[in-house]
Amino acid sequence: MSLGVGVTKRATTYGAFPVVALAATVMLETGERGSLSQAADGLQAHFHISDFWIGALPTSMTLIGILGSLPFGHLADRVRRTFLLAGAMGIWTLVMGLNALAPTFLFLFLTRLGVGVVEANGPASISLLSDYYPVRERAKRIGLYQSGALVGSALGLGLAGVFVDTWGFRAAFWMWIPLGIATVIVLLRTPEPARGHQDADFHHEEASVDLMGVDAASLAGKLDLPPPTRVGTLDYESCTWREAYGEIFRIRSMWFGVVGITVSSALLSGLGFWGVPFFKEVHHLSASAAGGYAVVFGLGAAVGVVSGGFVADRLLRRGIVNARIYVAVASSIIATIVFVPAFASSSLAVTLPLFLVGGFFLTLPVAPADALLTDVVVAPLRGRAAALRSIVRSVGGIAPLVIGGLKGAFGLQTALAVFTPIYAVGGLIMWFAARTYPADLAFVAAESSRLHAAPEAGT
């Protein structure tokens, strides 16, 4: 396909299959967390553990996520990423079987560390998405990828509740094994895209792009951006670890964004585990009924996670370069305003509508924020940048542990209501990214020109 005079399109065109395959990994990761919350009562009764230790279970996997992120991020920039993900999902599926057979709580706690392998492989998924689809579709595709989490939540909260009520807490682990095996097979059949070709095509399209584009970087030549605050000279293919990570640490907007997302994601992490127990304890529901009501939140969240990218892209087409940031900040504040009374109320008639609306605004920032963090990183460093972000964002995984401690002191209803404002705090931190995002974006555009001008000059 021609991009212009004498220029041929480099990137292969992919359909929906790759994003569905990658979304399956998020589905399993999120769904298993939901089913773990359904199994919480059975685990406490069987192993005689406190609220603090049951809250520590979802937190334990972040240990491997932290330790594994850097080496997996490096591998994501060097090896076939689809096979890397398939191997991680194979380990995850094995761990599910071990969890189901756990004879003691210590055994269960230690084997759950293997669940973190999927979280450590997050950089590979983000890197793949950037190479499967055109730059201007990035926010939309990330939104579709993240929607896998909503499918997982529906399975983990709804279906797992029925299984746990029928067969006991171990069913919350057994149910994922067939899906894990199927995901491994799908990933092995998923093609590996060429690295950087989508960005190269964007570089050639820049001369003719108009404001119908929906990626911030692709609008760099049409928006009133400041000049880059730094000049790129790094050879990304042969640079050392120190040079690569040194370059990543210079991206100020990315770090404001990732810290803001980390703080905000603590509520998502906490709600993912304690949401079902909230309906059980405060509204006195069974596991299956609580899971059914929790799906109401999932409906709002499903619309939000898909809509976020479209809303930000629409604003971007109007020339608002900080659109991703504005959407994330505004929705974080609105979600907080909605969820505080939702948790404080003891009436389902009040809580359910607020959960539906709150779920929408809680996930609305997800795709714009992830796209923002990708926009400001040059293509050859995306895997390693995503690895660093995963390490920082894993801190949000301690939320179930913190809420468990607050629950023991004040009760679950108060604990969730008190913890919720942290979501707005994360949004306000992200606001500071707006100051440096345009300049960082201009740097990526300049680097795209530099990197692709060199091979063309040599032909």
For the regions a language model picked out, list residue spans one by one.
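Central cavity-lining transmembrane alpha-helices of secondary-active solute carriers
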Residues: 59-72, 295-308
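Cytoplasmic helix-loop-helix junction between adjacent transmembrane helices
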Residues: 111-150
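Structural signature of the two symmetry-related core transmembrane helices
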Residues: 83-97, 322-339
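Juxtamembrane intracellular "pre-TM" segments in multi-pass secondary transporters
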Residues: 3-12, 199-256, 282, 451-456
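Helix-loop-helix hairpin linking two adjacent transmembrane segments in secondary transporters
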Residues: 145-195
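Conserved MFS/SLC helix-loop-helix module at the cytosolic interface between two early adjacent transmembrane helices
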Residues: 67-105
